């Protein structure tokens, strides 16, 4: 079966799954924006994705296939990340500038979303850990599903 569009998300329309089993189809963060890919469902059946150009990135809970008994949905595998919580605006600027020079994709959370303080989230990298340790910057290594997939963006100077 070839899927060309995603029309439903179980978090937007929870009533869609009533009376049916929900089975997660696991995706890594790095493939969520790929239009064309093949995935294996439980039981060995393969499902092809051939999404239209400009289609939104796959989200947790997107319905891939459904029948009377079962709904197959996107389940995003958590990503190994560093949640960096600088102590003040000066330290935040230093960290953002230093890691930005490495062209690391980063995301940010407001106080109370992930931690009590505002945080910068980057994918785990042992060199970043060394940098943070060398500069006594507070961080926590954890796994989470980021709200937006991490993407390396090209750049020029």
UniProtKB/Swiss-Prot annotation:
Keyword tags: Chaperone, Cytoplasm, Nickel, Nickel insertion
Record's GO cellular component terms: cytoplasm
Subcellular localization, as worded in the UniProt entry: Cytoplasm
UniProt-listed SMART domains: UreE_N
Gene3D superfamilies: Urease metallochaperone UreE, N-terminal domain, UreE, C-terminal domain
Molecular functions (GO terms): nickel cation binding; unfolded protein binding
Gene Ontology BP, a term: protein-containing complex assembly
Stated family: Belongs to the UreE family.
NCBIfam families, alphabetized: PRK13261.2-3
This protein's name: Urease accessory protein UreE
